[in-house]
């Protein structure tokens, strides 16, 4: 429900290995070949590579002066992704800018720059970046998901829904698109269709806080308070500070007659996200419902 760094924003990591090797025959002949290859591996990263190590690897590659222009663009893009993952958006965005300057035909850094702007709350700049990514690659499902996320933040729910539809058409296995469409359909009142989208995601992703949160909203809007509490609680087990799940659970508890528990949840949600009661009013849910 709540768009955050962990929800609906999809970054693109470009594989630099082959490009960097092909771009620098001299590096392959250098006594420091092992360092160079090691930095490629670090910059490409994996789930087990720390963000700091990825940044160090990309920085070393950039400073080496080796590789093609395209490879250098990839290194900047990958370092920007690592900075974004660390929450250092003011460093990430200049890296994406530099990647775009070096390789303006690559859609990935445009997508990633948009993701950073989205996290900063600069929605118009994010939208511009995603538009450019899609212009360069009209089949870029991840960029459609991210652009839909901007439309959600701008309360343009119909446009968001169409974006998720297109992302699913392009990449049917993209869970973020199904989860995002579930939430958007729940807001728009297409509750059965929303439920089907959420259930599809939760069949394969048991730890998806956002989708549990979205399904909780569906149950709340259909008057199933117990089911809503269960789903909001599942979301909070994964993400204890998810304000929308706290607020939704609070409403469900109030409807079940648990005033003390409901008030505690709602107060906690408001402490995390001011104005969340206004958000829920836009979603068609009020405390008095």
Where in this protein do the model-derived segments appear?
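Structural marker of alpha-solenoid helical repeat scaffolds
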Residues: 64, 68, 102, 136, ...
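Residue signature of alpha-solenoid helical repeat architecture, marking inter-repeat boundaries
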Residues: 31-33, 70, 104, 138, ...
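N-terminal leader/linker segments that initiate helical-solenoid repeat arrays
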Residues: 26-66, 70-73, 282, 289
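Conserved alpha-helical positions within TPR/SEL1-like repeat arrays
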Residues: 44, 74-84, 97, 108-119, ...
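Structural signature of tandem alpha-helical TPR/SEL1-like repeats
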Residues: 51-52, 87-98, 120-132, 154-166, ...
């Amino acid at each position: 429900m709540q768009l955050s760094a962990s929800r609906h924003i999809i970054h693109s990591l470009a594989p630099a290995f082959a490009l960097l090797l092909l771009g620098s025959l001299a590096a392959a002949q250098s006594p420091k070949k092992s360092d160079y290859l090691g930095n490629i591996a670090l910059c490409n990263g994996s789930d087990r590579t720390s963000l700091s190590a990825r940044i160090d690897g990309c920085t070393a590659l950039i400073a080496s002066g080796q590789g093609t222009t395209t490879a250098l663009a990839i290194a900047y893009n990958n370092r920007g992704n690592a900075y974004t993952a660390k929450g250092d958006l003011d460093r990430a965005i200049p890296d994406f800018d530099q990647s775009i300057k070096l390789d303006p035909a690559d859609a990935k850094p445009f997508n990633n720059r948009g993701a950073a702007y989205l996290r900063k709350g600069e929605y118009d700049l994010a939208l511009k970046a995603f538009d450019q990514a899609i212009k360069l690659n009209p089949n870029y499902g991840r960029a459609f998901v991210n652009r839909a996320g901007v439309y959600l933040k701008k309360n343009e729910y119909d446009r968001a829904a169409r974006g998720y539809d297109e992302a699913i058409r392009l990449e049917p296995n993209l869970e973020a698109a199904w989860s995002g469409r579930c939430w958007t359909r729940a807001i728009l009142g297409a509750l059965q269709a929303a439920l089907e989208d959420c259930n599809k995601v939760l069949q394969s992703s048991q730890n998806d806080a956002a989708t549990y949160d979205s399904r909780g909203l569906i149950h709340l809007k259909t008057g199933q308070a117990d089911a809503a509490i269960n789903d909001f609680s599942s979301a909070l087990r994964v993400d204890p500070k998810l304000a929308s799940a706290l607020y939704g659970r609070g409403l469900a508890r109030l409807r079940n007659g648990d005033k003390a528990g409901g008030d505690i949840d709602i107060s906690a949600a408001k402490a995390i996200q001011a104005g969340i009661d206004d958000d829920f009013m836009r979603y068609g849910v009020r405390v008095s419902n």
